[in-house]
Amino acid sequence: HLKGATALVTGANGFIGSHLVDQLLASGCTVHGLVRESSNLKWLDASKVHLHRVDLAQPDFIVPALEELDYVFHCAGLTKAKSRAGYFQVNATACSNLYEQCQKNGSRIKGIVHLSSLAATGPSPQGSLVDEITPCKPVTFYGQSKLAGEEIASQYSQSLPLSVIRPPVVYGPREENFFTFIKLIQKGWELQIGRAGKELSLIYVSDLVEAMLAASDPSKQKGRSYFVTDGHVYVWEQIAKECARIMNVQVKTLRVPE
């Protein structure tokens, strides 16, 4: 459904956004990318992507090329901010502006994918799983702002072909936070924050991109939220042990209170 289509990716220069751009181009799409004035574009080929400098933190930002778009992938988001208001401006309020413009001027749009986060749901009880109908109880400003963004997306899904994707920890080339964890192990340290045995889900970035492209398919049901994982449950100690085995290093555990 993507060959010959035109797609917009917000946060196109980011870890997930840049991988999505690569796959859209490989699928035969014309791609427009929203980036900030200060964005590092090292993972984007400016000769293949129509780049637009747009600051989603500004309340009056304008979405370019809306009349041409078949698909919109909203990947832009703020994972670190100085205040609660900073998170909410980009992760929630900006969604309202984006989808309002899509509603008014995006008459060709066949699919919108809103990239949220497992943080919008909040942590699961130890030993338990969460699913799409589990009540959301985010515990951080980031998670609360992502949930607010989801709620805005849900309102617009009444009139727009919109789906929400909630990834867990995403890993792969170009990622920095998970890579920092691995680099510490390479140096002989396993950083353990809080209690031992913390469970988590993972997804490889190319698998997440595949799920996002599938969710954009016009034949798929819209107005829904989806968790996407690799289907396994991990604990951090298990991941650290496997990383240490692959790199053939001995590690010491450094415990930090949560």
For the regions a protein language model found, what residue spans apply to each?
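NAD(P)H-binding glycine-rich loop region in Rossmannoid oxidoreductase-like domains
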Residues: 40-45, 50-93, 97, 121
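Conserved Rossmann-fold NAD(P)-dependent oxidoreductase catalytic core, especially the SDR/UDP-sugar
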Residues: 96-141, 163
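Active-site Tyr-X1-5-Lys
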Residues: 139-163
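N-terminal Rossmann NAD(P)H-binding glycine-rich loop of SDR-like oxidoreductase domains
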Residues: 7-27
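Mid/C-terminal beta-alpha module of Rossmann-like enzyme folds, strongest
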Residues: 218-258
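Glycine-rich NAD(P)-binding loop of the Rossmann-fold in SDR/ketoreductase-type enzymes
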Residues: 86-97, 136, 140, 144-145, ...
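Substrate-positioning beta->alpha
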Residues: 148, 175-180, 194-216, 223-227
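Flexible, glycine-rich beta-alpha linker
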Residues: 122, 163-180
